[in-house]
């Protein structure tokens, strides 16, 4: 403080000397300097406490806002880490659901294919059975038709042959032999 007063006094003295004695006298300048110092001293004495309190309040509010900002930053960091963790969990669940959906689709596909194959096998078996039944019917009908035709042809041939006298004689002889054998038997 003393250095400041000395500096101000010297500066004002040199400024007065450089003016060419047209300004204030050094005594007046010193008196004005002392008045200013007294004013500053009174302001310091009476304003020290309120100014100090104002600076302390300002400092405390800055510190408090920094602490609050740091606390909010830490809370935001925690929320961010929780959100990242939830995002990772959601991604894992989505992958699991996708995998499960694919597995379910594959299982359903296999079931549908197996069912279709079973139905196809049953249809083939039924078709074979139907074909066999129809084939047997056709064989029987063909055999009956063949027997009927053979019978008709045989009758026609027999009728033609019976028209011959030699055949009639042989037939009568054979019938007579049969009758004799029956009598004897």
Swiss-Prot record:
Predominant localisation class: membrane
GO molecular function: proton-transporting ATP synthase activity, rotational mechanism
Domain of life where this protein originates: Bacteria
CDD domains: ATP-synt_Fo_b
GO CC aspect terms: plasma membrane; proton-transporting ATP synthase complex
Cell location: Cell inner membrane
Membrane topology: Single-pass membrane protein
Transmembrane intervals: 27-47
Keyword Transmembrane among UniProt keywords: yes
Keyword annotations: ATP synthesis, Cell inner membrane, Cell membrane, CF(0), Hydrogen ion transport, Ion transport, Membrane, Transmembrane, Transmembrane helix, Transport
Keyword Transmembrane helix: yes
Protein family according to the UniProt entry: Belongs to the ATPase B chain family.
Subunit organization: F-type ATPases have 2 components, F(1) - the catalytic core - and F(0) - the membrane proton channel. F(1) has five subunits: alpha(3), beta(3), gamma(1), delta(1), epsilon(1). F(0) has three main subunits: a(1), b(2) and c(10-14). The alpha and beta chains form an alternating ring which encloses part of the gamma chain. F(1) is attached to F(0) by a central stalk formed by the gamma and epsilon chains, while a peripheral stalk is formed by the delta and b chains.
Physiological role: F(1)F(0) ATP synthase produces ATP from ADP in the presence of a proton or sodium gradient. F-type ATPases consist of two structural domains, F(1) containing the extramembraneous catalytic core and F(0) containing the membrane proton channel, linked together by a central stalk and a peripheral stalk. During catalysis, ATP synthesis in the catalytic domain of F(1) is coupled via a rotary mechanism of the central stalk subunits to proton translocation.
HAMAP family the record matches: ATP_synth_b_bprime
Protein name: ATP synthase subunit b
């Amino acid at each position: 403080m003393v250095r400041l007063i000395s500096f101000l006094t010297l500066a004002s003295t040199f400024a007065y000397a450089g003016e060419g004695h047209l300004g204030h006298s050094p005594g007046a300048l010193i008196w004005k300097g002392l008045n200013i110092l007294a004013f500053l001293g009174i302001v310091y004495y009476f304003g020290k406490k309120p100014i100090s309190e104002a600076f302390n309040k300002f400092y405390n509010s800055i510190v408090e806002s920094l602490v609050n900002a740091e606390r909010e930053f830490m809370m935001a960091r925690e929320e961010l880490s929780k959100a990242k963790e939830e995002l990772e969990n959601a991604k894992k669940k989505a992958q699991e659901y996708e995998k499960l959906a694919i597995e379910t689709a594959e299982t359903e596909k296999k079931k549908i294919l197996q069912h279709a194959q079973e139905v196809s096998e049953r249809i083939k078996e039924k078709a074979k059975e139907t074909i066999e039944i129809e084939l047997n019917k056709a064989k029987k009908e063909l055999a009956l038709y063949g027997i009927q035709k053979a019978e008709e042809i045989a009758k026609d041939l027999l009728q033609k042959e019976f028209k011959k006298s030699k055949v009639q004689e042989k037939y009568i002889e054979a019938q007579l032999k049969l009758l004799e054998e029956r009598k004897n038997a």
